[in-house]
From Swiss-Prot:
SUPFAM superfamilies: DTD-like. Gene3D superfamilies: D-tyrosyl-tRNA(Tyr) deacylase. It is found in: Cytoplasm. GO terms for cellular component: cytoplasm. This is D-aminoacyl-tRNA deacylase. It comes from Ectopseudomonas mendocina (strain ymp). It catalyses: glycyl-tRNA(Ala) + H2O = tRNA(Ala) + glycine + H(+); a D-aminoacyl-tRNA + H2O = a tRNA + a D-alpha-amino acid + H(+). InterPro entries: Daa-tRNA_deacyls_DTD, DTD-like_sf. A motif (Gly-cisPro motif, important for rejection of L-amino acids) lies at residues 137-138. Its EC number is 3.1.1.96.
Amino acid sequence: MKLLIQRVSAARVEVEGEVVGGIDQGLLALVGIEPQDDQASLTRALHKLLNYRVFSDEAGKMNRSLTDVQGGLLLVSQFTLAADTKSGMRPSFSSAAPPAQGEALFDALVEAARARHPQVATGRFGANMQVHLVNDGPVTFLLEV
């Protein structure tokens, strides 16, 4: 599972002009699910999302987690993160999970996140989405679990 996380001061997802999910301060996580991902991957991913220290403390050091700052978490499924880009001039998506598996694991991630964190929003799986964000920093990390 690949997670592209961005520290944001605000973010929202629109589908066909309608806002389907949004947060204020927090993390936007683009989630790429791969065929080998399972419940253990999901558990590790959620632990990282909630506890990875990317928010500044009083000294300006990245020492606070999403849980510490009680920020929002916006989860957006993005199968293109799992693309194979090593050869040629066109990405291959054979390394991404099949849609049914991807949707099941993404839904399970959302459900687990909502059980452990008070502010969770999402995009819409499989939809053509417009993601709007204000990257704070900018701070962006690619996590692989």
